[in-house]
Amino acid sequence: MDVINLIKNLKQILRTANNERHLIELKNIFVKQHLLPLYDELKKSANKKEMGLLINNFKQQIEFVTDQILKELNDKDDQVDLKKWTNKTLFAPFINNGHHHILNSIIDDIASFFKKLNFEIVSGSEVVSPIYNFDHLNIDENHPARASADSFFINSIKMLRTHCTTTTAQFLENNVNKDIRIMSFGNVYRKDDDDATHSHQFNQVDFVWVKEGLTVANLKWLIDSLIKYLFGQNLKTRYRLSFFPFTEPSFEVDVQCFKCDLKGCAVCKKSTWIEIMGTGMLHENVLKAANINDIRTGMAFGVGIDRIAMLKYEIDDIRYLYSNNFKFNAQIK
C-alpha cells in the first residue's frame, strides 16, 4: 500500500471542499474506499501486528491532513471581504448512502448464519411475565435476579425482560414441531450502572435447538462455526464448566485472543483468552415447562451483541454504541 501517494491524493480531494461539511463528507468517502477495506485484509493477514501499525499510522495521517485542510479552509474564509463580494451560490447537499448501525449489522450477520440452518428468527415483546422470565427457566424464587434491585418490574405480573431466553421459552412452549430451531434477538434490561462495560439496556441474541439425539458435541460444533463466521478466523475456543439455572451442563465459552498473538494484551487482560458467551444443554425442568416430555434434548446459548461489537471493532466504551455520534458511526460500516 502506497500511503504517501494516497495521502497526497487525499490532500487534493479535500482542497476541493467548499465548506467544513463538504470536507468531512469527502474525507468519509476516502476512508470508506481506502481505510476500511484494510480492516478486512487485517483479518486474513499473517502479520497482524505489522499491518495493524500500518493501518493506525494511515488513520492518523488522514486525521492530520483533514485538520490541516480544515484550518486552511477556515483561514481562507476569514480573509473574505464581505463588503466587496458575497457568494450567492446555493450548493446542493452532498448525499451519502446510509448504512445499518453496527449492532444491527452484527444481528443481521448472526441471523443470516442461523437462517442457513433453518432456524426461525423471532424478536418478541420486551415486556414479559416473570413466569417466562424466571419460572419456566428454572430460576428459583430466591434468585437475586428476581429482586427489584436487579430487574425492572412494571408491576407484579409484568417486567422488562432480562434476557432473550424469555422469548425463546415462549416460542418453545407453543411449538409443536419435533425439530425446534429458534433464534431470538432484541433489547434486554438490567439494573446495572452505566459505565464503560455495562449498560442498563443492551442487545442480546439467544438460540434454542430441541431435537432427538443432540449432544454437547453438536453444541460445540455450532458455536465454533458461528465464531468463525463472525470473526473470519479459525479461532481456538475453550469451554469452562459453569452454572446457569436453565442449562445442565453449563459452560462459559472463551475464544483465543485475536489481537495479541497469544502475547497478552488489554483486550484479553493478559490471559490470551476472551470470554464471549454462556451456553449449555437445556435443563430438563425447562423442557418440562415447555411441555416437552419425550426423549428429545435441547441446547442453548446467549450472547451480548454489544460485547461482540466491542471485541470485533476494538471499542473500549459501550456508551459509544448508543451515543449517536456521527464521527464514531461513520468509522464503522
Curated annotation (Swiss-Prot):
CC cofactor note: Binds 2 magnesium ions per tetramer.
Catalytic activity: tRNA(Phe) + L-phenylalanine + ATP = L-phenylalanyl-tRNA(Phe) + AMP + diphosphate + H(+)
Cross-referenced PROSITE patterns: AA_TRNA_LIGASE_II (PS50862)
Residues holding Mg(2+): E248
EC number: 6.1.1.20
GO BP: phenylalanyl-tRNA aminoacylation
Enzyme class: ligase
Cofactor(s), names only, from the UniProt record: Mg(2+)
Matches recorded under NCBIfam families: pheS
Subunit (UniProt): Tetramer of two alpha and two beta subunits.
Protein's UniProt name: Phenylalanine--tRNA ligase alpha subunit
Gene: pheS
